[in-house]
Amino acid sequence: MGQKVNPNGFRYGVTKKHNTLWYADKKDFADILLQDDKIYRFFNKFTREYLIGKVEIRRNQNGHLSVLVHSAKPGAILGQNGENINKLTQDIQKLLRNKELKLNIEVVNIKNPDLNAIILAEQIAIKLENRAPFRVAQKFAIRNAMKSGAKGIKTQVSGRLNGVDMARSEGYSEGEMKLHTLRQDVDFAMATARTTYGAIGVKVWVSKGEFLDGNGEKNVTTEKN
């Protein structure tokens, strides 16, 4: 079953923390959930520009909204003298139609972007759009991830590869990838490359080892006897 479901959703509440954390009354739940969806879609547009690897949303009982943006280019999000992040704040307030919204955007630096599945998937998609061979694009990402300390990585591209008439899927993997083991820390992401031959789907799985029993933060390497 672990091979068929989204590895992130499979682990939320077990070994992965939810990206959204808040409580709301029943009458307000739908509106707040819709706001979260708009915020996620807003930052998805900047994934490539700012190398955004994760977005977290936190709300307190006073209605204060905090958005944590994990990025490999925090300086680009902040802008000179914080001008860009102020603009992003105003854009979100306008999107949610609430200029009085207490909103705080925090930028978290991603120390190792080569272990982030979202960034790796977007890098492969960019190379495909620049007409790089799909094998080279995947192996480049695999090599960088393994050098950065990944325990395993798996990639897959699907579509009209190299412009052939019949669409197909092709992927590569290296290291361990236990999708059926919930204590295995697996990061998963998808991206789309818009090429002259049509859309090509990209999937990336990154394994960072196994969680210790009762600890959701520290990882250990799995060794085979």
Swiss-Prot record:
One of its GO terms (biological process) is translation. GO terms for cellular component: cytosolic small ribosomal subunit. The keyword Acetylation does not apply. Residues 39-109 form the KH type-2 domain. Part of the 30S ribosomal subunit. Forms a tight complex with proteins S10 and S14. PANTHER family: 30S/40S RIBOSOMAL PROTEIN S3, SMALL RIBOSOMAL SUBUNIT PROTEIN US3C. Binds the lower part of the 30S subunit head. Binds mRNA in the 70S ribosome, positioning it for translation. This is Small ribosomal subunit protein uS3. The gene is rpsC.
